[in-house]
Amino acid sequence: MSEKRYEFATRVAGLLPNPLREQAKHVQEADDYIKLTYGYPSNQAFPVEKLAKISEKVYRDHAFDFMQYGETEGIPRLRTQIKERLAKYQSLDVENNDVLITSGSTQGMDLVFKIFVNEGDIVLTEEQTFVGAVNAIKSYGGTVQGLPFDFAAESIDTSALKATLEADTEHRIKVLYLIPTFQNPIGTSMPLEKRQEVYDICQTHEVMIYEDDPYGDLLYAEKTAIPKIKSFDQTGNVIYAGSFSKILAPGSRLGYLLAPKVVFEKLVLMKQVADSFANLYWQYLASQLIDDYDFNEHIDYLRQLYKEKMDTMISSLAQKSDDNMEFVVPDGGYFISVKLNDDIATKVFYEELEQRHIGVIPGNIMSAAGSGYEQYFRLNFTLPTLSEIKTGIERISEAAAAAKQTKSPVI
């Protein structure tokens, strides 16, 4: 049988498989393989017993509701609960904005880029960013432009942001995509004054801000949470994205967008085209969980669980770095970013990691440009056990030492 020739749309020509998911397919399944890679929650984080109890109530009270077609916007009760929490705990304006329940936060960003990005438009991001956002932007013919990240300021370079927008005389830049709280992959949180500055610059140039906040509830340090960029928004210039994946279960595929009402209406239209509505069973389950239990108590449990893991990883890195690595200490979230010293050969380092059965995420995978951060790698501390964290960091230290010894001297 001859091979059929398919004429695919030009918008998919430049897309590549998500490198994080591709890497997952090829991870060695050796018994002692330690994965410090994926942004997965711990299995200990899932409120299994509570969900089992309330599932009986959901089946009894809402069986026909979740088996039938549903509202695109999401079930009213869950949307109201989200609004109440955002208003009470984040001081966000829920009167001039509305909540759309999405099929995971990934769909949320897809919908936003779908309504704002035309072929040839530009979306600004941090230089190191979530790879899923990069693919979503490219899928609509958009160009991803990474802004320099100021590690000392824990923020994008706001001078570069201002200069970039001032130079955009054709108004091709449509959205600034940011993860300002516990950034992925770096782990830092943008300071309050930088958030205000970013908002002011984008408002002046009429560029939408997409504030992606999947980790925002997971603050482990004894500090006051930094206000969201959305909390400054009085003119409808910010779309705020939240998720249940990191605080309930990624299998729920529940996310949400808080968007200005005019934007909300367009998002609803696009979601009707995409999948009509998010999983109704999980919407009712999440809503019932919030009704029947203290959801803040559940989040506090997650903070305690993950703080111990983060502290263990930080302590292990501090003990085992041996002047070969430096790392960012986050206040929360899922990740720690590590930088290898320049005298370590990265190719050899990753080969040594593979031989030692340890998985990390290389920095170039998380780069907006797909390159340029070869000396960096990302570690996840939420999924592995404490023992795996300690052993994993020890193996990483050994790999770094081996790579340092083999690097050819510069002549």
Predicted features by range, described:
Residues 13-104, 291, 359, 403, ...:
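N-terminal small-domain helix-loop-helix segment of the aminotransferase-like
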Residues 65-206, 210, 217-235, 306, ...:
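Conserved core of the PLP fold type I
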Residues 231-304:
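Conserved core segment of the aminotransferase class I/II
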Residues 258, 337-339, 380-382:
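Short hydrophobic/aromatic beta-strand micro-patches
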Residues 287, 303-314, 326-339:
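Conserved glycine-rich beta-strand-loop-beta hairpin in the small C-terminal domain of fold type I
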Residues 324-357:
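Conserved PLP-binding catalytic core of the aspartate aminotransferase-like
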Residues 355-356, 368-411:
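PLP-dependent enzyme catalytic core of the Aspartate aminotransferase-like
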